[in-house]
Amino acid sequence: MSERQIHSVSMELAGRTLTLEAGRFAEQANGAVVVRYGDTMLLATAVASKEPRADADFFPLTVDYEEKMYAAGKIPGSFFKREGKPTDSAILTARLTDRPLRPLFPEGYRNEVQIIVTTFSIDMVNDPAPLAIIGASAALAISDIPFLGPVGAVQVGYIDGKVQINPEMPDMPNSDLDLVVAGTKDAVLMVEAGAKELPEDLMLEAIIQGHQVCKQICDLQNELVRLAGRPKREFVPPPVDTSLEEAIQQWLGNRLYEAITDPNKMVRDAQTEALKQEVIAHFTADEPEEELEARIAAVSTAFENLLYEEVRRMILERGERVDGRGPKDIRPISIEVGLIPRVHGSGLFTRGQTQVLTLATLGSPAEEQRLDDLGIETTKRYIHHYNFPPFSTGEVRRLGSPRRRDIGHGALAERSLLAVLPSKEEFPYTMRLVSETLSSNGSSSMASVCGSSLALMDAGVPIKAPVAGVAMGLITGKDGRWRVLTDIQGIEDHLGDMDFKVAGTAKGVTGLQLDIKTTGITYEIMREAFAQAREGRLYILDKMNAVISEPRKELSPYAPRIITLQINPEKIGALIGPGGKTVRGITEATGAQIDIEEDGRVYISTPDAAAAQQAVAMVEALTREIKVGDIFLGKVVRIMPFGAFVNLAPGKDGMVHVSELDVGRVENVEDVIKMGDEINVMVIGIEPGTGKVSLSRRALLTGETAEDRRAAGAGRGLRDGGGRSGGSDRGGDRGPRGDDRQRPRRR
């Protein structure tokens, strides 16, 4: 057996060392590379089937990102103590890795390719997401799989007014930008970003700076290819029967143009499909039975190619789109809010034949989503879920758990609203939004952004500004011509070269997603796309503002009311009680949900205003800082010969000495009060250290102050700190000691 050859290359990146290593792990994979950056370490593998998939009319690429809990020194929390289905975070990282790689495989390549990225070590400093892209690209680059890469990737932040490459994870909460850019040495391929209302020129500058570093990372991968690369498999693209296309084009004449130029998607699709079947019938009529299936496939492919060319020719040569719009035109928009009863907020956004209904639900802080993945355990108080049922495109499909696309679209819309949400101090609610795609003809994710903004305002959430989103497309020609399209629909997304989604306020960008279907786009195209996107976004915002321009002043009557209290953190234990008994008792008595933060913030949530006030009173009574001079209405809970104990708050009693019960001399405590009586008392002393409380009923009867009673009772031990046993039991006008206290007799 030959000795294993291990090859490694490194570069300095943002003050840390980025290392790529091949040859140590997974030797049976077509390509395997370990990426290390700081102490974050990933293994990326690439494997391709030996033969193309016969039934595939698409490129069968699968990318999986495997989060292993050992990478963060954790044991999985499930019953089986084993990793289960991928988390949303893992799915989003897999999609992020897939998107820049997919355009770089040869046209017509149909071999199955599987990329698996496995986390070996996570240091909580260096984000693994861009490293997954680098590792996957490097594994493909050194393999024998046909690939037009490599691809570099970096994270870009904007902190203290400066663009920063690969900021450390603890610094990201202070960043106004969280952007991942990926590209080859020649062009940008993918961008994913969330931002705090940043201007378009700054976003473009961040992309450009990030891409410059991507070029260096591509050089590093090429160096590894020189050391460890394998010869590429020979791949010959399937031949294109141009004579068949020409024959179909001549037979069709102008009929294809007439079929696809209808503003209604359903009519257009029906006409196009009918024409396609007519073409197939005509050009397979004389085909022998044994060759019929292959001939049908060839005619179908030729027709689709003609459709592709016709749509693109219309746009490039005449600026004409299939629904009659110009390149910058936006489809008709319809907006409604408050449609659905009992939900806390709703917004219906319709743009052309894309329609999304977004519904908002407000909950207590206890309903925040807990995230326990490879990162630090955190919670999420704003949650957005996107649903794409089959009826939205007139299809029949089995319903099941959310698909990767659904999770990705939901995350994009969620990220696009984060910049305008109120802080927890301003608005302590947990917010869950669900976008139901009711009809789809392109750009449903951006319709979800618009619907989310509408639903939040309808729910009375005090967002800083409305947010809208628009999807931009691109058509490029072989002669270098190109056109950017505003508000693309399904056919333009399918047949175009770019899907560039931009969300934001009137002030700036809050969300961004760029996917390219060619080998990249130039900075000039991106600059034009940003400009057109801003123009389109402002137009949509005007339409939205005409219906609802600011949050409603009142919450829905069906939404819980949350009251925030601030207590001394030292009182948290008293509020919770042993095993949570006390706080559960408040919930059982009032029906209110009580949530307690470590800093002493207490959230009381319930739709019932009276119950809320009752819960507030109980919490305040439990956590009230008792001070000398305070007056309480308390219940007598114990009577002794020397006085009575009065309950001031749950778990907190004080003692009224017999001399403080009444104005005159009291021989018997029960001559004045009985067990269960409620009496008004004043705090006249608190014993340091123990916190025992001395009370006086007499002070309230005579109009004296606590200071007066302490001065009068100096001889009885009522010093500044109060007397023993939580109250005074000495001196004054008491009777003999035997009347005051019963002592056990010694035997």
Swiss-Prot record:
Catalytic activity: RNA(n+1) + phosphate = RNA(n) + a ribonucleoside 5'-diphosphate
Gene3D superfamilies registered for this protein in UniProt: GHMP Kinase, N-terminal domain, K Homology domain, type 1, Nucleic acid-binding proteins
Cofactor(s) essential for the protein: Mg(2+)
Keyword Cell membrane: no
Class of this enzyme: transferase
Residue span(s) of domain KH: 560-619
SS bond partners: none
EC id: 2.7.7.8
GO biological process, one term: mRNA catabolic process
Residue numbers spanned by region Disordered: 705-747
Binding site for Mg(2+): D493, D499
Location of the protein in the cell: Cytoplasm
InterPro entries cross-referenced by the UniProt entry: ExoRNase_PH_dom1, ExoRNase_PH_dom2, ExoRNase_PH_dom2_sf, KH_dom, KH_dom_type_1, KH_dom_type_1_sf, NA-bd_OB-fold, PNPase
Domain S1 motif: 629-698
One Pfam family here: S1
PROSITE patterns in UniProt: KH_TYPE_1, S1
One Gene Ontology CC term in the entry: cytosol
Entry similarity comment: Belongs to the polyribonucleotide nucleotidyltransferase family.
Record's function text: Involved in mRNA degradation. Catalyzes the phosphorolysis of single-stranded polyribonucleotides processively in the 3'- to 5'-direction.
Name this polypeptide is given: Polyribonucleotide nucleotidyltransferase
